Amino acid sequence: MASLKDLRDRIASVKATQKITKAMQMVAAARLHRVQEAAQSARPYAQRMAAILANVATDVDTIDVPPLMRGTGRNDVHLLVVCTAERGLCGAFNMQIARRARQQIKALLSAGKIVKILTVGKKGADILSRDYKALMIDHIDLRSVKRVGFAEAAIISQKIIDLFDKDTFDVCTLFYSEFVSVINQRPVAFGLIPMGSPKGAVEAEDVTQKVDENKNLQSIVYDYEPDVASLLEELVPRNLSVQIFQALLENVAGEMGAKVTAMDNASRNAGEMINKLTVAYNRQRQAQITTELIEIIAGAEAL
């Protein structure tokens, strides 16, 4: 049985931990409002750009479609871009994204495909490297970035374009977590390359409906200057950056939401533990007082 001093030390330790978790919860909650607003505000732009691009692609000959849109024409080598958080303490947020990526990896390997992995975020790299280190070809570290912006998305998209130009892969799929609410983040897979169809070209079943929500744009007739091929050459790489930027924003919002929930649960658990330890401390203290009183009374009677 723990002594009174041990119980006091444990209570003090748990209280100190509770202060930390409450502080982290407050910080995450303060950031959540800003990043949630950013993610939700950027969605219409990303959705409409993808829809317009898909519509424009129908007005150009196949031979004039940029390679990033039409792909290589093969389906043999798959590049999986897995975006997770750089830090932990956010519940199962990172594990859910990694689990979705694992499912896709297993399905592709079972189908005889070649899989290559590009990770964005330390936690995803740590998780996937346990089983698929040999498949990981590169990693993008964003730990030094205080606030994710379009510049980081452009770096990632340029890395993907460089790999594509080197004929490193045929199909590219982006994995991230779509922010639904503070307590709900949905891991999804989105087809980046080829991007000739609204849903991209992935074998995943839960591809986000970024374009399906804008089907009304497909009936619009466009005029192009100088010509549609030149327009696509400019729009396609930018659309790649835009979709990645949206994924990064969704990820940050999801991470903060998961962190708020995780720290709230941790604070509640700490409170319950403090109550249990306090009860144990009071019982042991009362038992010790009772024992001392009995010894005093017994000594007095002996005299």
From Swiss-Prot:
Subcellular locations according to the entry: Cell inner membrane
Record flagged with keyword Ribonucleoprotein: no
The UniProt record lists the keyword Transferase: no
UniProt entry keywords in alphabetical sequence: ATP synthesis, Cell inner membrane, Cell membrane, CF(1), Hydrogen ion transport, Ion transport, Membrane, Transport
GO CC field: plasma membrane; proton-transporting ATP synthase complex
A GO molecular-function annotation: proton-transporting ATP synthase activity, rotational mechanism
Coiled coil: none
Membrane topology category: Peripheral membrane protein
Record-linked SUPFAM superfamilies: ATP synthase (F1-ATPase), gamma subunit
InterPro entries, per the entry: ATP_synth_F1_ATPase_gsu, ATP_synth_F1_gsu, ATP_synth_F1_gsu_CS
A Pfam short name: ATP-synt
Main location: membrane
Entries under CDD domains matching the protein: F1-ATPase_gamma
Any one biological process term the GO annotation gives: proton motive force-driven plasma membrane ATP synthesis
Function: Produces ATP from ADP in the presence of a proton gradient across the membrane. The gamma chain is believed to be important in regulating ATPase activity and the flow of protons through the CF(0) complex.
Assigned protein family: Belongs to the ATPase gamma chain family.
HAMAP family: ATP_synth_gamma_bact
Quaternary context: F-type ATPases have 2 components, CF(1) - the catalytic core - and CF(0) - the membrane proton channel. CF(1) has five subunits: alpha(3), beta(3), gamma(1), delta(1), epsilon(1). CF(0) has three main subunits: a, b and c.
Protein name, per record: ATP synthase gamma chain
